[in-house]
Amino acid sequence: MDMRIYKNIPKRILSLCLVFAIGISMGVLSDHFVSENSRFQTFTEKLFRSEVCSNTLTLHYTLAHPEKKGIRKPEATLGTALSDPAKTTSLCQEYEKELKSFAYSRLSEENRLTCDMLLLYFHTRASLGKNSALDEPLGPGLGVQAQLPILLAEYTFRTKEDISDYLKLLSTVRPYFQSIIKLEKQKSQSGLFMSDTTLNRILKQCHSFVANPDSNYMDDIFAQKLKAFSNPAFSSEDQKKLCTYHHKLILTEVIPAYQELADSLESLRGTGKSSRGLAFFEGGREYYLYLLQSQTGTYVPVGQIEKRLSAQLLSDYREISSLLEQNSSLIDRLNQCSGELTLTPTQMLEKLPELMKKDFPELNDATYELRTVHPSMKKFLSPAFYLTPPVDTRSPNVIYINDSGRTSSLELFGTLAHEGFPGHLYQTVSFAENNPSDIRYLVTSSGYVEGWATYVESYGYEYAASLMKNPDSAQNAVRLAWLNRSMNLCIYSLIDIGIHYRGWDAARTAVFLKAFGINNASTAAEIYQYIVETPGNYLKYYWGYLNFLDLKTVCQKRLGDDFDLKEFHRRILDIGPVQFPVLEKYMKQWN
């Protein structure tokens, strides 16, 4: 442009023209940014509404008031166990294509993070393909037949409509189980049915559930919840009628559904292979890699995972040896520690937020309820667990205590750190304070969630020492306890890879365990069988833990004296549950 035309324009007018031009361009750009972010948020909201309505349990546990988000409750259903792999792959690819259509550079940082997480999620889901035939909904520990009664028992009654939906759900257990039966028959025909050993363990659970139909624990819990209901409260007569109807549904719907499931599974006995890992099945190794990516959130080669696990195992072993060399009576001191930790679970949870202040950011609000597990459910549940609140109410945050006396007070303290502060409850509340988009609650990363809880559990052990009679002498003893737990989780993680990726059988696993002093044949067999039935489960906890540990080391090296532990934790919590490549990408921005 020939600038000479401006030579006679007064400077003040020229400056106004420039300001006006900049203002127009900024306005256009701003509208463009707003438009792209608005379009992206519309997409994620639509995705959330679609996913959250997949079944009544998902909707109820995620949203307390779906109507406020314009979501109409569908007819109560548990959904189906059957799926169309080709349709699922196609849908995931469509979502991936739509995500790539957004102008990434015009998205806000929060939306870019969500976009990165969703892209990786759908790309991974689409990679499953025909290997979805290896999915197993049943299992002695984490199977749907074991978890469903607990999910139904904990179904919150906020309104009378919730009670009505719950009762309708009981009538859908049978068709849901029938879809599982159909799936298991397909697996049997394809040579993918479970081993007789796993079958026996599942049947034992089913038979236990139906053994005493007139004294089923779900009846007791329902009556207890009705009595506590106050929106509005039921009369004694109405409570009695509802309890009678509930008992009828248990007798005519739920128990027959479990009996039919057990009978159908029994008819397939002998059609599966002996207890073996995924490596023995066609596509098994690829499916295992998919589990590591989708559940653990890691995309690191298996060989690299094994190398890191082995290094940690050696490091922990050397530290234990060093501690015992310095003080040979440390094990005796450790045995004393639990006796010195005389706090009740309530007192432990009250102490933890104060003890963790030096290492973790404080929360604005972290109210919670402590409840005791119903006596009839004690044998089915862990020593403590956290029940995530609906995303639209963010309350109640409930921690259940199972006082069955199966753990020492030190182990319970560590468990409460894992489930409460600074573990699951703390992480959930902290993340919610940033008001993330709803889809972030549905599409998450178990590796982040369980890895974080395991990572902070180590701090819980450290905090426990400060509550004992002689904190200084207790510190090393408690450190010994954590290192022992770390080594156990590491050993199980290596076995997980050995069984499902390297093809270890029971004998090879027993040899590996003997190297660490586990010589009891029945113990080795139980460890082997559990890991066969829960591929990748230990890695969610332990590989997740190591990712946080290594990320801390990387940040310490990069920032040097500027590294601040509390700030490190704050940034991880602000990013929230994502796959580890995404977490690492955004943590690199910390300078």
Task: Specify the residue positions occupied by each region the protein language model found.
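N-terminal maturation segment of proteins
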Residues: 6-591
